[in-house]
């Protein structure tokens, strides 16, 4: 718990402007938050930041924010508060987000300094790498916290969260909760948004791990170079967010570039690049399970048995191993732990006794879609079909390439709705379909492209199409259990829909495939 005077003088330093005289005192501060409806205690500061439509200061008198003992805002927020006749202490800074991380960390007692913190960033593979780290660390005898896309866990207990990387106040409160539970290691996914917006500011990272970089989030980042620079905040020596140590997969040009700017880096490769950690002797079973050897510094090697299919998961596992090694985790135990990993909605097999392969995967960016389809092609003797869509209000430039790459690899591409959000679903589908048709024209094999807006129906058609020895994948939503359409989230789980369609097919209840387009 921090008093208001120390917060203003010590943490905000010279950034504070226009602080009313009655703001200076020994008022105890136990929490800070951005959400007016969920501020956790009355001994709290409400942080009011500008939003896309309104300024957060407009909500200072509503819900739990009305009980806050002070308000942290910028000059524009101060104007709003003055017009509303605000009488509570108002701390004014140039940029609230720039100081929010450090302030939040201090209020909660700098919790990330009390455990080993490992951050995983990159376009694809963050969730799987984090799961591999969690299980490996647990097998090595550590008490582990996990923060990521599929949720948050404290020593195996689920904790609800909304974002891949929570806002700084929520994150520091989570860290404090983990510290108080005796957690020794925390693994978290760190998005480019989190780095750019300062959500992880004030956090002390022992290791940062970089998976890869490919097209995504170009609605937020104007260029791929800008996207790279956001990730590089975790690795550059001159960045305030730099981790103490870094591990970087150098199997693509972006990884090689990241390694070249990193401060204290060890490298990873599964494709024969010169690296500190490498994977060799890779063997793949008929089920897709993999065994391989990780070669570590000082001529050490470790045998790994991995249930997860795909060459990209060998890379994820080797990166996870390297990150753990950098903080002194026992390698043999860590390797054993990775063998136990299954990740919801990531290459997740759905088996109802059918004689073809059915998979649900979170792939929702071009490179990920290509990697999943390439992996499945190696596991089947027959044809390959995919249901694919693209999210609304997100990077629109990846829609065509997702369709194109799908049709270059599959025999059947069914374009459907993903999460349209506020966009017109047909407009999104048209872009994906155009890409798929282009890919079909470029393919050496005959490719059928269908457009079926109803996602459940698209899945039913895909399942009915499949014959013995074929493979099908429903891509895009993975672990998600809702579909966001026009501001409303409807329950929808790809895994449930695939199981239902398989059950109907096996019970001979599905109608024959009809021509749909």
UniProtKB/Swiss-Prot annotation:
Gene3D superfamilies with a match to the protein in the record: Mur ligase, C-terminal domain, Mur-like, catalytic domain, MurE/MurF, N-terminal domain
Protein name, per record: UDP-N-acetylmuramoyl-L-alanyl-D-glutamate--2,6-diaminopimelate ligase
Membrane among keywords: no
Gene name linked to the record: murE
Protein species of origin: Corynebacterium glutamicum (strain ATCC 13032 / DSM 20300 / JCM 1318 / BCRC 11384 / CCUG 27702 / LMG 3730 / NBRC 12168 / NCIMB 10025 / NRRL B-2784 / 534)
Keywords in alphabetical order: ATP-binding, Cell cycle, Cell division, Cell shape, Cell wall biogenesis/degradation, Cytoplasm, Ligase, Magnesium, Nucleotide-binding, Peptidoglycan synthesis
SUPFAM superfamilies xrefs: MurD-like peptide ligases, catalytic domain, MurD-like peptide ligases, peptide-binding domain, MurE/MurF N-terminal domain
Cofactor(s) essential for the protein: Mg(2+)
Binding-site residues for UDP-N-acetyl-alpha-D-muramoyl-L-alanyl-D-glutamate, renumbered to this chain: 34, 36, 164-165, 191, 199
